[in-house]
C-alpha cells in the first residue's frame, strides 16, 4: 500500500515537476546559445547594439527562470503537502487504509525527490549552457604544453582531494542532513500554521520556520566559538547534531499534530 501511496503522490505532481524541469532545460539551452552568439557573431554586438541588448536581456530572463523554477519546486511541494493534508482533499487522504507514518513518509520522500529532480535539471542546464558556450572557444590554439599543464594541475587537485577524503565526506553528510532537516522544518511549519493558526496559517508558518532557523543558527555559532583550533569541525558537528535533532523532533511533532489534533489515533 505504501508503494501505491507513493505512486499516487507522483501522479499528482509529475506534470508540474516535468514542466519546471522543461523550463529549466530550455533556459539552459537559450543561455548557452546566447553566450555562443555573443562571442561568435560580432554583428550582434558591434554591428547591431539592439540585437546584442535583446540577447543579453533574453539570457537574463532565462537565468531568472531557472532560479524561479527551483524556488517554485519548493513552494509547490509545500502547497501539495498542505492541500493533501489540511483541506477537503486531506480528509479523503486520511481515510486511506494506511497509518499516519506512511502518509508523512510518502509526502517527505516524494517532496525530496521532486525538489532533487528540479535541482538535477538545473545542473544539467548549467552543463548544457557551458557545453554550447565551449563550442566557440579556440580549442585548436591550445598547445600540447598547455594541455600537459592542465593535466598536471588536475592530477594535483585529485591528490589534494584524496588527502581530505574524510573532510569531503563530512561536508557531504552535512549538506544532506541540512537539506533533509530544512524540508522537515518547512513541513512542520506548514503543519503548525494549518492546525494552530487556521486564520493566518501562512504567517504562523513563517514565524515557526524562522524561529527554528534562528535557534539552530545560535547553536551553530556557539559551536563555532567554543571549538577553538577545531572550530570548523566543531561547527560542522554541531550543524549535523542540530540537523538530526530537527529531523527527529520535527517528524515527531508532525506525527503528533496530524494524529492527535485531527483525531487520527
Where are these regions (language model features)?
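Hydrophobic alpha-helical transmembrane segments of membrane proteins
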Residues: 1-90, 100-265
Amino acid at each position: 500500500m505504501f508503494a501505491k501511496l507513493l505512486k499516487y503522490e507522483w501522479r499528482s505532481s509529475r506534470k508540474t515537476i516535468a514542466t519546471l524541469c522543461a523550463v529549466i532545460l530550455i533556459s539552459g539551452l537559450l543561455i548557452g546559445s546566447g553566450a555562443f552568439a555573443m562571442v561568435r557573431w560580432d554583428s550582434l554586438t558591434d554591428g547591431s547594439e539592439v540585437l546584442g541588448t535583446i540577447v543579453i536581456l533574453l539570457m537574463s530572463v532565462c537565468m531568472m527562470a531557472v532560479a524561479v523554477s527551483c524556488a517554485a519546486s519548493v513552494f509547490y511541494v509545500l502547497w501539495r503537502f498542505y492541500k493533501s493534508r489540511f483541506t477537503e482533499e486531506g480528509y479523503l487522504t486520511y481515510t486511506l487504509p494506511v497509518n499516519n507514518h506512511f502518509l508523512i513518509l510518502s509526502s517527505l520522500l516524494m517532496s525530496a525527490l521532486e525538489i532533487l529532480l528540479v535541482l538535477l535539471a538545473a545542473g544539467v542546464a548549467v552543463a548544457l549552457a557551458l557545453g554550447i558556450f565551449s563550442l566557440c572557444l579556440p580549442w585548436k590554439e591550445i598547445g600540447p604544453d598547455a594541455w600537459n599543464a592542465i593535466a598536471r594541475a588536475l592530477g594535483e587537485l585529485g591528490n589534494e582531494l584524496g588527502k581530505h577524503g574524510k573532510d569531503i565526506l563530512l561536508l557531504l553528510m552535512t549538506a544532506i542532513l541540512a537539506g533533509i532537516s530544512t524540508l522537515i522544518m518547512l513541513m512542520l511549519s506548514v503543519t503548525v500554521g494549518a492546525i494552530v493558526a487556521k486564520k493566518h496559517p501562512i504567517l504562523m508558518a513563517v514565524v515557526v520556520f524562522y524561529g527554528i532557523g534562528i535557534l539552530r543558527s545560535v547553536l551553530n555559532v556557539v559551536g563555532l566559538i567554543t571549538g577553538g583550533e577545531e572550530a570548523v569541525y566543531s561547527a560542522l558537528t554541531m550543524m549535523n547534531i542540530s540537523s538530526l535533532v530537527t529531523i527527529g523532533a520535527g517528524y515527531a511533532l508532525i506525527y503528533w499534530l496530524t494524529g492527535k489534533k485531527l483525531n487520527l489515533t
